[in-house]
Amino acid sequence: MNATPAVADDLIVIGKIYSVHGVRGEVKVYSFTDPTENLLQYKTWTLKREGSVKQVELVSGRGSDKFLVAKLKGLDDREEARLLAGYEICVPRNLFPELTDGEYYWYQLEGLKVIDQLGQLFGKIDHLLETGANDVMVVKPCAGSLDDRERLLPYTKQCVLAVDLEAGEMKVEWDADF
């Protein structure tokens, strides 16, 4: 394991190690990628937890019913693997595949100001949630917001009118009373 990770501002969280698997040092991983197995395409991971940062190399991985199982280079013991529980798995954003126009990674949407069709500022996108039907944006109030309410807005074509990453804004069709 290497202690010299990539620049922290360039790293995007794509998963989390949450437990050990078996007795040979494998770890159980929750993937934030879609599909979940995409996490296994990245061979070098930067692990972060409470100020601790380290780089590891993925040797192999496989899917299971509810999680991924990963084997990391130099990790051959269950007790060593247990120490990695709770670490976030990060990779540099420049390794992400290019998207087509109108497609965005969640990290690109987080922090955007959300403005309705009347020009009212609802707040900023704090994070997104994956639901069965569609993704949901959690919009928290910020300086200049219409009110101090947290809003949950669907990330759908009907709701999202425009995304302007340069301006840091998203225009939405949404009733302020919802």
Swiss-Prot record:
UniProt-listed InterPro entries: PRC_barrel-like_sf, PRC_RimM, RimM, RimM_N, RimM_N_sf, Transl_B-barrel_sf
Main location: cytoplasm
Biological processes, Gene Ontology terms: ribosomal small subunit biogenesis; rRNA processing
Occurrences of domain PRC barrel (ranges): 100-178
Cytoplasm recorded as keyword: yes
GO molecular function term, any single one: ribosome binding
Any one Gene Ontology cellular component term annotated for this protein: cytoplasm
Subcellular location: Cytoplasm
SUPFAM superfamilies in the record: PRC-barrel domain, Translation proteins
Range of residues in the leader sequence: none
Keywords tagged on the record: Chaperone, Cytoplasm, Ribosome biogenesis, rRNA processing
The keyword Repeat appears for this protein: no
One Pfam family here: PRC_RimM
HAMAP family referenced in this protein's UniProt entry, alphabetically: Ribosome_mat_RimM
Function description: An accessory protein needed during the final step in the assembly of 30S ribosomal subunit, possibly for assembly of the head region. Essential for efficient processing of 16S rRNA. May be needed both before and after RbfA during the maturation of 16S rRNA. It has affinity for free ribosomal 30S subunits but not for 70S ribosomes.
Record remark: domains: The PRC barrel domain binds ribosomal protein uS19.
Family of the protein in this entry: Belongs to the RimM family.
Subunit and interaction comment: Binds ribosomal protein uS19.
Protein name as it appears in the record: Ribosome maturation factor RimM
Species, as recorded: Pseudomonas fluorescens (strain SBW25)
Gene name of the encoded protein: rimM
